[in-house]
C-alpha cells in the first residue's frame, strides 16, 4: 500500500507554529506552485484541523488527504480543483 502523503511534490514544515502562521505559510507556498501540484503540510497546531480544510475550500484548492489522529498532523493539498 502506497502512503498518499509520500507522493507530495512540495513539503511545508509548520511544526511549532501557531495560528495564523501555518495558514499564512501555506498560502505563500501555494502561490509559487503550478496548478495541479501537491503540497504536504506537517503541523502540530490544533487550529490547523479547522484552518487548513477551510483554506482549501475558500481558495478553491483540493484537500486530497489529512491525518489528524495524532501529532504531527499531515495534510495533502492539491493546488486548484
Swiss-Prot record:
Keywords: Cytoplasm
One Pfam family hit: TusA
Active site: 19
PROSITE patterns the record matches: UPF0033
Keyword Cytoplasm assigned: yes
Family: Belongs to the sulfur carrier protein TusA family.
Identification of the protein by name: Sulfur carrier protein TusA
Gene source species: Shewanella denitrificans (strain OS217 / ATCC BAA-1090 / DSM 15013)
Amino acid at each position: 500500500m502506497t502512503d498518499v502523503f509520500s507522493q507530495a511534490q512540495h513539503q511545508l514544515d509548520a511544526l511549532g507554529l501557531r495560528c495564523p502562521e501555518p495558514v499564512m505559510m501555506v498560502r505563500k507556498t501555494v502561490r509559487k506552485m503550478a496548478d495541479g501540484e501537491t503540497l504536504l503540510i506537517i503541523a502540530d497546531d490544533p487550529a490547523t484541523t479547522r484552518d487548513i480544510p477551510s483554506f482549501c475550500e475558500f481558495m478553491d484548492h483540493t484537500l486530497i488527504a489529512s491525518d489528524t489522529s495524532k501529532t504531527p498532523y499531515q495534510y495533502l493539498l492539491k493546488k486548484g480543483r
